[in-house]
A protein has these predicted regions:
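Extracellular beta-strand solenoid repeats
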Residues: 3, 10, 16, 24, ...
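N-terminal extracellular ligand-recognition/capping segment immediately after the signal peptide
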Residues: 1-22, 26-38, 69-85, 98-109, ...
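Acidic Gly/Asp/Thr-rich repetitive segments characteristic of extracellular carbohydrate-active
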Residues: 1-4, 59-64
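Short glycine/acidic-rich loop motifs that flank beta-strands on beta-rich extracellular proteins
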Residues: 12-14, 28, 34-35, 138-145, ...
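Right-handed parallel beta-helix
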Residues: 65-102, 122-215
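Consensus "Asn ladder" position of solenoid repeat domains
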Residues: 132, 165, 188, 193, ...
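Short alpha-helix capping/helix-loop boundary micro-motifs
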Residues: 50-58
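The right-handed parallel beta-helix/beta-solenoid scaffold, focusing on the short coil/turn
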Residues: 7, 13, 19-21, 29, ...
Length: 286
């Protein structure tokens, strides 16, 4: 257990959690807040095997910073997104904690920005985050969508617990977990995000979301692709654009006893998907 004592802690990088770690705060008195983001263009090409980048202007960047590198893929025009940490510096050139594994060529207009989740879980299990306040400092940060970040972000994990957490003001999602199984979110308050309040991400099995309050988000609870055998129960959704959204291959979920109030565009939305006979949201009970 890592106990976070009362205070405001300003983050220049994510807190990366490991197996069997419990983060225990002091409620509203323990606040992790993201520092303002800085964005700059890259000044030189970097190939997929490189572990360095060169910035046009390194003002606002320090060794230890979490960064998000983005560009257009030079081969197919798609989006390239890479999350790394700056670990060494020589002038405007920085070494990264790991190789790029994708090409960042000037033809794709690559940029670096100090964007990251506040608490980050990747390939871990049996993690708990409890009784803490997370502030994304939305007014001073660029958007980074919930496939990559949030106040809490998890990727390829299992058996996570988020309990009595206030997640607020992220320019993206509040809590997002991608291909994560048996995630429990209880008695949390996720509000005032540009993106989603709770985002059980693609392929996530058996999420339990119970007793949460979701306010003034783009969507309160968003079932991404292929979320199955989940429970969303006794949650309060207030003044979101959409209260609850469910769609592509989201099957066998129970959505029970939720209050969905004053939604701006829709209370509960079943997203249409006509690309295949099994692509719709089937056998869900509301």
């Amino acid at each position: 257990t890592v106990q976070v004592l009362p205070g405001e802690y300003r983050l220049r990088n994510a807190v990366h959690l490991r197996d069997k770690v419990r983060i225990l705060g002091s409620g509203e008195d323990s606040v992790l807040i993201k520092e303002a983001s800085v964005k700059v263009k890259l000044a030189d090409d970097s190939d997929w095997y490189d572990q360095e980048i060169t910035l046009e202007n390194a003002t606002g960047f320090k060794v230890g910073d979490g960064v998000c590198l983005r560009a257009k893929n030079p081969h197919d025009g798609g989006n390239t997104v890479i999350k790394r940490t700056l670990v060494a510096r020589s002038g405007n050139r920085f070494k990264l904690n790991a190789g790029l594994r994708k090409n960042l060529w000037l033809s794709g207009n690559p940029t670096a920005a100090t964007l990251f989740p506040l608490l980050n879980c990747e390939h871990v299990k049996h993690v708990a985050i409890e009784n803490i306040t997370l502030d994304g400092n939305r007014a001073n940060n660029e958007n980074l969508n919930g496939n990559y970040a949030g106040c809490i972000f998890a990727q390829d994990c299992s058996r996570l617990i988020f309990r009595n957490v206030e997640a607020r003001n992220y320019n993206g999602d509040g809590m997002s977990w991608q291909i994560c199984h048996d995630v429990v979110v209880e008695n949390c308050h996720s509000h005032d995000h540009n993106g989603l309040g709770l985002h059980p991400g693609s392929g996530s099995q058996r999420p339990v979301m119970r007793g949460n309050k979701l306010e003034r988000n783009n969507i309160g609870i968003f079932f991404c692709w292929g979320v199955r055998h989940g429970i969303a129960e006794n949650n309060i959704n207030i003044e979101n654009d959409i209260g609850i959204s469910i769609g592509h291959r989201d099957t066998d979920n129970f959505i029970l006893n939720n209050d969905v109030l004053r939604s701006k565009k829709g209370g509960i939305v079943f997203r249409p998907d006509n690309r295949g006979k099994d692509f719709g949201p089937h056998r869900n009970r509301v």
